[in-house]
C-alpha cells in the first residue's frame, strides 16, 4: 500500500511527539497548517488542556489580513498568540511544528512569536 503525504506528515508528527512534551512550566506551542488557514495553540500535555489559542479564522485577525493562508497571516497569528500567552504568564514554550517543515508559514509564525517575546 502506498503512503500518501497526509499519512507521512502524521507519522512525522508522532515521531516528534515522542520527544516533545509540554508541562505546566514549559507548555507546547503546537502549529497546524491547512491550505486555507493556520492554527496555533499552547498546550499543557500533563493536564491535557489548551491554555491559549489563536488562528487565522479569528474575526479580529480577518479584518487585518487579506488571506488566511499566507505568511502575513501567519505572522499576525504568531504575534497574537504571543501577546495572549504573555498576558497569561507563559513565556517559555516548546515548539511543535506538527510534522511540517520549519519553512514558510510555520517559520513566519514562530519568528513572529519570538519577536513578540516568547522563548523557545
From Swiss-Prot:
NCBIfam families: L18_bact (TIGR00060). Its main location: plastid. SUPFAM superfamilies: Translational machinery components. InterPro entries: Ribosomal_uL18_bac-type, Ribosomal_uL18_bac/euk. It comes from Porphyra purpurea. CDD domains: Ribosomal_L18_L5e. GO terms for biological process: translation. The keyword Ribosomal protein applies. It is found in: Plastid, Chloroplast. Belongs to the universal ribosomal protein uL18 family. This is Large ribosomal subunit protein uL18c. The lineage of its organism: Eukaryota, Rhodophyta, Bangiophyceae, Bangiales, Bangiaceae. Keywords: Chloroplast, Plastid, Ribonucleoprotein, Ribosomal protein, RNA-binding, rRNA-binding. It holds the Pfam family Ribosomal_L18p. Part of the 50S ribosomal subunit; contacts the 5S rRNA. Binds 5S rRNA, forms part of the central protuberance of the 50S subunit. GO terms for cellular component: chloroplast; ribonucleoprotein complex; ribosome. The keyword Ribosomal protein applies.
